[in-house]
Amino acid sequence: MELSDLIEVTRVRDAFMRKGPRPAQIGDICIFEEFWLLHKAVDRVLCEPISKENPQRGGLLALKCKNFLLIIFEIGDLEICRATARTIEALSNINGFLHDYAFFYNSPFTILDDGWSAFDPEQEFARLMLSTDAFRISSVNEKFSVCPSYPEKLIVPKGIGDDYLKISATFRESGRFPVLSYFHKETRSPLVRCSQPLIGPTNRRCREDETILNSLITINRGYIIDTRSKSSATSAKAKGGGAEPQGNYRQWRYIQCPIPRQREIHDALTRMVDVCSERKVTSDRWVSRVGQAGWLSAVAASLEAAANVAQCIYSEGLKEVPVVIHGGDGLDSTLIASSLSQILLDSDARTIRGFESVIEREWICAGHPFSLRNNHCAYAEGTVTGPFESPVFLVFLDAVHQMISQYPMSFEFDENFLIFLFEHAYASEFGSFLGNSEKEKKEHGIRKKTVSLWSHVHHPENMKQFVNVCYDPTTGVIWPSIAPQCIKIWDRLFFRWQRPDNSWSKPETETIQSLADHWKLREKELTAKASSLRRNVIELSRELRVSSPI
């Protein structure tokens, strides 16, 4: 079908924008050839008469967008209003991404730093080699022959041959065998991610997979972090999946750090957006509904899982403690935990380029299916939606926002950068978030035919809008609190379109400097206190182990 077949109306003249990102005004609605709102940014389209008693008054066209923006137009002719609604609905729900604007976008700025080559895996490996020689680059997945959701080049344990990797892939969900995600220089502890083992009801075993994991062990036992609940892991075993049996993985401790599943996250966001748009409700009832929505719980669970990973890697007095993370298919909660833990552990991941590198490695190249997950957001319902849609990446961004709220001086970027990434993950003129894997990017020539989002960000004129002027680089680990009173609603995300623009304006330079000085002092005090408390906990744990009877 041609795009022209979907277009019933090309332009609607003299429409009145009653509600939107601009002051109320009369103008034309252009379906194409003008760039104001991408078709893909529209999540749901509604059309109804202005007056049911008098249809001659025209219709109301409501566009509910994926970034929670609501736009309402008054159109004088009800039939034209309905035709416009059908057109926008069709264009915003085209299957696939080959007609997305990114393929037709011509960059208005000179690309000074090509984002497509900014995070080359071989460069990443070269930096890793400065810290350890225990790993190598493998081309076992050349032409995506072993695992379609992995990139072609992967970092794996040095002593493991490609034949073992191939066998392990048959034992792991979707072929996602263990690969290096991160290496902590100070403790020399590797972070590895994969998918669940396919042990099934018969307790199937794979000695090659056991060998791969055991090759990571040097002087201390490792940890396997499962991001599923106990019931989910048990249910998975009945369906052919499961978790590593202690008898076969004797050198590993198994820990469960559950993060909500895709559908739970999707429903939580829908409820959260609904609560945040509610006006006629008492404050007590509103607070109760926020808790019942489950969104903040999902963010807190993600932070808790990441903190547990970081705690295993950064155990005081212990070195070389390998950590393996997996959930089910390794495409969602696994990536949340692996990426957030790196931000906790590594100050470089809290810079703009370092954060981009985490997203590129742990989300885009790691195979998070952006096109499937972000096809719709919180408003869409009915037949246009699919079972694979879930705002998993937004949970990650909100968790980072919670870190910034608690450590406002430790990040080179501010929440504007996070919101920018959220919007472009759902609808963008750039190609970075297109497709579901590197395999799809290569098949459709996305890296050749589109502009990278990072090329836009790296331009000096663009980057300055994301810089945190209060940034004070710190090299230490950060430990955000997950206490309920510390996990806050992301105002700028959920209420951005409900407040006047000037309420979000940045304070004056003197005010910023005063706040910066205050938060620097406060952060140092809290960091020192947190370190002291952690030492006390470790000492108490050791005393308990010594005093406990054998």
For the regions a language model picked out, list residue spans one by one:
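Glycine-rich nucleophile elbow surrounding the catalytic serine of serine-hydrolase chemistry
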Residues: 328-342
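Cys-dependent protein tyrosine phosphatase-like superfamily
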Residues: 1-323, 339-550
